[in-house]
Amino acid sequence: GGDTTRCSASVSSIEDGDEDDLKGLINFLRGQDYFDYNGDCNLTNTREHYLGDVYNSDILVVGKPSAEDKFTSNNQEAYWRATNDYSTFASTHAERKETIYVGANDGMLHAFDFELGNEVWAFIPPFMMPELAGLINPNFNVSTPAPAGGTNAIFGVDGSPVQHDIFMRGIN
């Protein structure tokens, strides 16, 4: 059994600004069933699905540096790379682990290990912080027969990520 005094946590309780509710929201974002969506009054177990919906974001795979350094004109970015030792940077990072990036409607940019598929980290841009409480929807049914609970999509990190290596001479 869980903490039955908190079993009825709701959106209004996270909006009251109590420190425990703010921590609960953070733990909810990390996958904890803080709002008891499965109805077992255990607010510490892991939700079955906690990645936000991916509607508009393309998946981006980033691995070893692959920017071109062959050029035909000194007005090309490749010219700058070729004349500033990009090839050393690229060879230094040739074994960089492949990572999958995708934006989701939970307000986060997610990074996944390409080989294992597990989440490595997620980033919440500062402009999304005020929107996070809007994820909680205690009236949304997720199964049949359903306990109440689910999440609303919050748009803001649902665009496609882009990749560009940042190469600065003297910094590896």
Describe each region flagged by the PLM.
Residues 1-172:
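A fold-level detector for beta-propeller and closely related beta-sheet-rich head/sensor domains
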